[in-house]
């Protein structure tokens, strides 16, 4: 995998970067690599944090030094084709749309998209979204799959 980069991000972490775009293909590589890493049981791994295009690996340098860790991490790349990624779980989340208190953005999204509010709701609820990563606020998800017909600037 020529496009994979290993970036030292401090004295206790390494970032394995799989590309420079947000895509389901890169997400699948990150998930497979994370599973391979967990299965390898490399001593000293403290935590892994998947992102849109990379996997941050936190490690304990008193258990494993950087050079041997990097060798182990590079070795995992050849195993990704053998990893079975578990199927995604669909979680349905109830949503309340509209009104000043519950959904003040609905009118803006509809106007921006040139749609009725009902059309925006239909488009929004007829799509399955992929969770790429969890954010800094507990439970906050970064999703992919927004229909371009209702995509709006932040």
Regions found by a protein language model. Name each.
Residues 1-154:
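Conserved "landmark" site that anchors the functional core of diverse proteins
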């Amino acid at each position: 995998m020529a496009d994979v980069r290993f970036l030292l991000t401090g004295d206790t972490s390494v970032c394995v970067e799989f590309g420079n775009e947000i895509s389901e293909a890169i997400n699948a590589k990150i998930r497979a690599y994370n599973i391979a890493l967990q299965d390898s049981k490399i001593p000293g791994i403290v935590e892994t944090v998947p992102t849109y295009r990379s996997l941050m690996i936190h490690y304990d340098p008193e258990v494993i030094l950087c050079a041997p860790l990097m060798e182990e991490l590079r070795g995992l790349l050849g195993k990704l084709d053998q990893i079975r990624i578990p199927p995604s779980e669909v979680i349905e989340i109830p949503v309340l749309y509209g009104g000043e208190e519950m959904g003040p953005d609905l009118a803006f999204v509809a106007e921006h998209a040139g749609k009725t509010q009902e059309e925006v709701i239909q488009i929004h609820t007829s799509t399955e979204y992929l969770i790429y990563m969890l954010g800094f606020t507990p439970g906050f998800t970064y999703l992919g799959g927004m229909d371009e017909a209702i995509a709006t600037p932040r």
